[in-house]
Curated annotation (Swiss-Prot):
Compartment(s) where it occurs, according to its Swiss-Prot or TrEMBL record: Cell membrane
One Pfam family named in its UniProt record: HlyD_D23
Keyword Signal in record: no
Protein name, entry field: Putative efflux system protein YvrP
Membrane-spanning intervals of the chain: 8-28
Family recorded in the similarity comment: Belongs to the membrane fusion protein (MFP) (TC 8.A.1) family.
Segments forming a coiled coil: 106-183
Gene name of the record: yvrP
Tree of life domain: Bacteria
Amino acid sequence: MSKKKKWLIGGAICAGVLVLAGIGAGGFYFFTHMNQVAVSSEPYAESVAVYMGGDSESGQTFSGKVEPEKQQKVYIDSEKGSIKKTYVKEGDQVKKGDKLFEYEGEDHSDEVEQANLQIEMTNLQINRLQKSITETEKKLKVAGKEEKNQLQDELDQTNFDLKTSQLELKQHQKELAGLTKNKGSNVITSKHDGIVQSVNQDIADGATGDQAAGPYIQIVSTGKYLVKSQINELLMDTIKKGSKVRVTLKTGGEGEWKGKVTSIGKLPAGAGEGEESESFADEEMNPQSSNYPFTILLDSHKGLEVGYHVNIEVMSDNADADTIKLPSDMVIQDDGEPYVWKADENHKAVKQPVEIGETDENDMVEIKSGLTPEDYVIYPDPAVKEGKQVTVNADTE
């Protein structure tokens, strides 16, 4: 039954004429409200909210896993030596730049001293060669023809030696910089704010095999949460970037969270370099087609924890979700000024001026201003008068 017919039935009821408009959903609506108004001549008021769009499910559901927006996995570099000290434990809150742990590191003091000596000696050599070049150039200006040839050969050799020494200097400086950098990199710090999710002490203690697999420390951000999932290529047209979703726990419960799709992978799951492909066992995966990862950013995550497995319901797009539309015959024109009847706080009929927009193919007219979703509107049958007591739909009040 259309919204317009619903109002016609309501008006007929209020006039005391009981008309059976149909069966099924229409008959159910009629008998549900008949007892409320059949004994009264009061007009009937319905909530404006029922004439708004809102979310509805598209029928597509997926499985996913809650993940932090940012996470840092720190692996041990065996070339830097053993762990000297760990500064954090599981559950600690850290800020960007905080120390996580420190390597014992190798003692490079002898190498640093040797590099500094080589740099100093090379600089002395460069200075000597530059002075020799200056003196030779002066002699060339006053030398005879035979002497000039000899001095030119000396000058060419000295210039060659100078360039060689300058290259040696750059090499020694590079070696020193490398030694200094390695010394500073012994301390590993956090890349962002977050919580230490785990510290694998077995790795620090020198464990091997399966116990040594994985990161030494994992940090998860405390900001926004994501949901990671996959979609089969045959269903790619059912979601897009910006699609709204509803998330619920697989374990059940009343909690639900809203979010939207922020990215859809251009490569199949697991095809990216270093990318792990997670299997969603309860999804119907077509072996003859590929699955693509997509990510959801949640509006809030209170009650969710990283690692939770969830259900994802894609909401259908609805451009009229926040638009109020009423049956066109509910809008009355008074000398070109449109108005509707609505119930005031005392459940009495009052005229409400409105600004109207276009009328759609279903004969529903857009109400641009004058009404809110909290208002209750009345079908304009002959019984409606200014100040008339009305019956408000208790189901939507």
